[in-house]
Structures are given as C-alpha cells and as structure tokens.
C-alpha cells in the first residue's frame, strides 16, 4: 500500500510523539495503514513513556484522534484517555464530519470530564436546549456556541447560562436568536470576555460596505445589545461585536459601563463613526482596537 493511503490522524499522532523524543534518534516513515502498526515499527516503545509525558502529547490531539485512534492503542493509553484531566477543555469543531449521533458523542465527552469541564466550544447545528442544559451542569469558565443553532431558544440559553455564574468567557457566533444579554450579564457577574458575532450570517464576506445588503436586514441601527452590555457587564476586559448594528451612542454607553475594557473589536459595525471625541476616547481607554473597516481575514468563521 502506498504512503498516500496512510490515515491522516495516525500520522498526526505519530508526529507528536516524535517531537517529544529527547534522544534525537533518526526516525523512518512507514506506509502502514493503522496507528498500532505505525507505533510498533518505530524503534522506541512509545507505550513506555512516562504517563505525564503521554498525557501532554495526547492533549494536543483532536477529539477525532482521541476517540477513533489513541484510546484504542493499548490499555495504558485507554486509561489516560479516560482520565477526567483529559477533558477539562473540549472543542467539538473537528467532529463536524462525524457520521454518527453528535448529541450522544457530545454527552459522552462531557461525561468523561466527571464534572471537571471548564471550557467547551460547540460548533454544531444539532445543539438544542436540552443538550445545552446538560453541558452547563458543570462549573464552566468558558462557553463557545458557534454556527447557527435553530433548536436553541432564547429562554434555553438564559436558563443554561444561569447555571454557570462563574463563567468568564462567552462566545456566540451566527446565532439565529436574539440573546437576552442583560439577563446573561446579571447571571454571570464574573464575565470578562464577550464575543457576539453575526459575521457570515448577516453581512457579506468581503470587507466592503454594501448598503443594498444592509438595508434588507431590518433596523439599520440598534443599540439594544450595547446598552444591555453597558448595564450588566461592568467587568468586561475583552469585547468583540462583529457585524453589530450599534451606533456611537451604544459604543459610548459601553465605554461608560465597562471601565476595565482593554480589547475592543467592532469590525463590520458600520453604524459606528470612529472620529472626533469618540475616537479619542477609544484610543485613550482601549489597548487593542479593531475598527469597523479592518480586515476579517483572521476570523475563524470567515466564509462559513
């Protein structure tokens, strides 16, 4: 079998182990199609690595690699993969191509944390009020909800987030619902980072202002989100509001209500005019400012 037929995930896992080889011995590539045979043909017995080193390496793998490959190599790796410390931070984005029940998979990996889950990013349209409630039955510090999730309701989000008062980071991208930011802010008094982005759902992918597109999207100016943030999130340090319809009035309210704000991203917020006193105020208060017309090339959901 040719080298091109090797499993991508197996190659990824092997390369990580080779990086940790302190002996610096020359390694030869293999054309095997399985992770087990790849490892067996290597000079070094990777299974005999110290547990803490193995854990460090496995933590760098995707969920797909861990669930499909790593935990099946041997008993020791399976034991490590089932350790709750492996599941403190979870990102399900790499599981979008899985051909099985996403809900069951998500519940399974949440269960593996045994209540120790601190950070999770769920980028999947199968998300529902029920699954969100299940996820937030933990002491989360960071919650990311990406893509459009039509089966999640406004009340479902509020009820779920109300269960995690220690939440420090919240990211919501491409939401199909208007969030009750005031209720969320009051429920999470420790919130330091908020990312609320509509880019890709409501706005064109290019960085050009297109009034023909914008005029079909309902109210052209709306400061509801900005005023709710200003009123209920005084401890914010990092705020990202991409493709929001806030105006100068809303931005001024945020600067008044969030005195600790240091990072502000208002790309695609074309109802803001950063000139004069408002621009001066932002430059004096904000350490890192992303303006409405700045490029969104580094935005992970660009083109989604």
From Swiss-Prot:
Keyword field: Leucine-rich repeat, Repeat
Pfam families assigned: F-box-like
One MF term in the entry's GO annotations: SCF ubiquitin ligase complex binding
Protein's UniProt keywords contain Repeat: yes
LRR repeats: 132-159, 173-198, 218-241, 243-268
Keyword Coiled coil recorded: no
Xref: InterPro entries: F-box-like_dom_sf, F-box_dom, LRR_dom_sf
Signal peptide: none
Residue ranges occupied by any F-box domain in the UniProt entry: 43-90
Protein name: Putative F-box/LRR-repeat protein 21
Native organism: Arabidopsis thaliana
Lineage, broadest ranks: Eukaryota, Viridiplantae, Streptophyta, Embryophyta, Tracheophyta
